[in-house]
């Protein structure tokens, strides 16, 4: 989930070449801020600057940012400013789409970025920190993005005593050593998505304090809807057995594995009305050309392409759907499926579980937190490989399923309707326990400690 981040960058970041760029850079002369930031003095409140994806986006990062901010806005002793990046002017949002709490100050990082690059506003952040003088700067993203912000902050040699916290999105079992060194050198505190990811960091030598900040489920937004009515509106046969994948068509999501598994499944059961719905592009944005791949897989199996060609459905648009639209897709399907070779949380599958739809997912990463044999089909990822930075800027150890194993996992719900129904009910029951209030509690606790320390020093 990282819209418009280049994932095929052949250039190794400067901060990965040498830690000198982090710890020994000369100060950068920064022009005065043009941002509409809060005053440096906020009536004795603790000041937090959250650096993350703007809430007016269609990515998982934006959803999580919104969930966190809404909880933090309830704290009367906390002043919150959001340095929200990658809100692109060409994107249109409906009125009322993720309205920010009135007491959260918002800085549009993409708008401030001159000249415009990728909309992150890396070089503008030091200016904002100098103007706002926050007690805590908290950066949320994967380490390739976090690292670029840290480099710019370090170059600026900022005055003041702000602390740097990192909400670290991990998708693979290993982080590159340069990123680990950066966290140990620069971060005062780290937050991981799950206990599993926390232990993963600790096992790689992280010495900084690590807390767990999970994700929450928006039960007022994602809720069960009548499936038959949805299918009628979408012109999908009521008797169809529909699998759904809402992930973007990008390398980590391994749509090639999904298409191979699906082709095997439809050929194995030619008389069953099996369909796959993918809410992504067809391949024109640099991912897999899904229809070409599917056609080839059918030909390799010696079947008539016309017989099964219409079983793969790909949305005509992607990255434009409102949360309410996504809820409709979730409810349209019988089963959700994920074929990724690394997953930090698995937000799409998590949300679909929340409306009562069971999932077929790899037994990796964030899925281990909320998926079990009682609410999902967990497929073992038997293939392991290491990613070069030319392929992924975060590198790491990927774990992928064999397409045949994924096919067998998808087959379980196709052939056992009672298991599918039972798992769907259990999935919803599980996910409903993940509230944002519960998720943000560890962060609130740490912020409260900082507020008490600040008051004691006053």
Located regions from the model:
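C-terminal alpha-helical cap of glycosyltransferases
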Residues: 15-22, 436-458
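Conserved donor-binding/catalytic core segment of Leloir-type glycosyltransferases
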Residues: 49-50, 237-253, 259-262, 276-278
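Carbohydrate-associated surface elements
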Residues: 196, 216
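A short helix/loop element that forms part of the nucleotide-sugar donor recognition site in Leloir-type
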Residues: 222-236
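Nucleotide-activated donor-binding/catalytic signature segment of Leloir-type glycosyltransferases, i.e.
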Residues: 288-328
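Aromatic "clamp/platform" in nucleotide-sugar-dependent glycosyltransferases that forms part
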Residues: 341
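A charged, aromatic-enriched C-terminal amphipathic alpha-helix characteristic of glycosyltransferases
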Residues: 401, 405-406, 415-445
């Amino acid at each position: 989930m990282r819209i418009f981040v280049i994932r095929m960058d052949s250039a190794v970041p400067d901060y990965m070449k040498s830690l000198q760029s982090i710890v020994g850079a000369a100060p950068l002369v920064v022009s005065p801020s043009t941002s509409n930031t809060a005053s440096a003095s906020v009536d004795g409140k603790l000041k937090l600057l959250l650096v993350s994806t703007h809430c007016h986006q269609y990515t998982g990062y934006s959803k999580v940012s919104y969930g966190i901010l809404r909880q933090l806005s309830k704290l009367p002793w906390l002043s919150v400013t959001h340095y929200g990046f990658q809100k692109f002017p060409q994107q249109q949002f409906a009125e009322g789409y993720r309205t920010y709490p009135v007491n959260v100050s918002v800085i549009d990082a993409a708008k401030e970025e001159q000249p415009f690059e990728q909309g992150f506003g890396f070089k503008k952040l030091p200016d904002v920190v100098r103007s706002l003088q926050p007690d805590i700067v908290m950066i949320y993203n994967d380490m390739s993005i976090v690292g670029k912000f840290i480099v710019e902050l370090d170059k600026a040699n900022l005055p003041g005593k702000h602390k740097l916290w990192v909400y670290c999105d991990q998708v693979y079992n290993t982080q590159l050593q340069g990123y680990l060194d950066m966290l140990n050198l620069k971060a005062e505190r780290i937050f991981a998505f799950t206990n599993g990811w926390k232990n993963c960091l600790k096992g790689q030598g992280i010495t900084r304090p690590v807390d767990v900040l999970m994700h929450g489920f928006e039960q007022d937004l994602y809720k069960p809807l009548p499936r038959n009515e949805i299918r009628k509106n979408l012109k999908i046969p009521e008797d169809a057995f529909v699998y759904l994948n809402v992930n973007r068509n990008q390398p980590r999501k391994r749509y090639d594995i999904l298409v191979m598994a699906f082709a095997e499944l439809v050929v194995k059961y030619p008389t069953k009305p099996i369909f796959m719905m993918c809410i992504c592009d067809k391949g024109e944005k640099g991912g897999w050309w899904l229809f070409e791949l599917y056609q080839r897989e059918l030909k390799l199996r010696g079947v008539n392409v016309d017989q099964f060609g219409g079983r793969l459905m790909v949305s005509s648009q992607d990255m434009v759907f409102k949360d309410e639209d996504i809820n409709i897709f979730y409810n349209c399907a019988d089963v959700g499926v994920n074929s990724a070779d690394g997953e930090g949380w698995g937000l799409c599958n998590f949300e679909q579980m929340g409306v009562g739809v069971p999932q077929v997912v790899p037994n990796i990463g964030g899925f281990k937190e909320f998926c079990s044999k009682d609410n999902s089909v967990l497929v073992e990822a038997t293939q392991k490989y290491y990613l070069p930075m030319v392929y992924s800027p975060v590198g790491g150890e990927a774990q992928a399923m064999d397409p045949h194993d994924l096919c067998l996992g998808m087959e379980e719900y196709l052939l056992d309707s009672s298991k599918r129904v039972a798992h769907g009910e259990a999935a919803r029951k599980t996910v409903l326990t993940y509230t944002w209030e519960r998720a943000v509690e560890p962060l609130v606790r740490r912020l409260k400690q900082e507020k008490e320390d600040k008051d004691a020093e006053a």
